[in-house]
Amino acid sequence: MRYQKLEIQEANWQWKYLLKKHREGENITKHTEQSLIELKVQFLTTLQHSPAEIEQWIKAEMTAEQRKRMRQSIRAKRKRFFNAEKLTTKKKSIDLDYASWLRLSKYSKTHAMTLSETINHLIDERENQHLYSEQMAKMKASLKDLLK
């Protein structure tokens, strides 16, 4: 396993995930009767600081498909959480005008690169172009000196 699972943290993420889904109007239990769902969710709200009981609630009250979706969401959250600890893997964001983003996106698609790779590629090209023009200017100057 690449990212360490911390039981208390995982349970807290699961608890928050379930309550968020419930607030969004999604059924987080295997039950269909509204009063029973409310009762089960009400019980879940009391379990915030009980990781073992949260796990038992999940096993008892959720369908396999619901558990699978929750696990995928928690796995993604765990990855983002641990990647955010290191500066090299932490995601950064930049603001682009739509037209700039569109041009960058088209360029990256035609060259089969990600947006990050495309930005690096364009910067490298520009730096190489600058070095080339400097070298050409030096060569022209030295040729002029030789011809004098």
UniProtKB/Swiss-Prot annotation:
It comes from the Bacteria. GO terms for biological process: cell division; regulation of DNA-templated transcription. It holds the Pfam family MatP_C. One of its GO terms (cellular component) is cytoplasm. One of its GO terms (molecular function) is sequence-specific DNA binding. It is found in: Cytoplasm. Its main location: cytoplasm. Keywords: Cell cycle, Cell division, Cytoplasm, DNA-binding. The keyword Transmembrane does not apply. InterPro entries: Arc_rbn_hlx_hlx, MatP, MatP_C, MatP_N, MatP_N_sf. Required for spatial organization of the terminus region of the chromosome (Ter macrodomain) during the cell cycle. Prevents early segregation of duplicated Ter macrodomains during cell division. Binds specifically to matS, which is a 13 bp signature motif repeated within the Ter macrodomain. Belongs to the MatP family. Homodimer. This is Macrodomain Ter protein. The gene is matP.
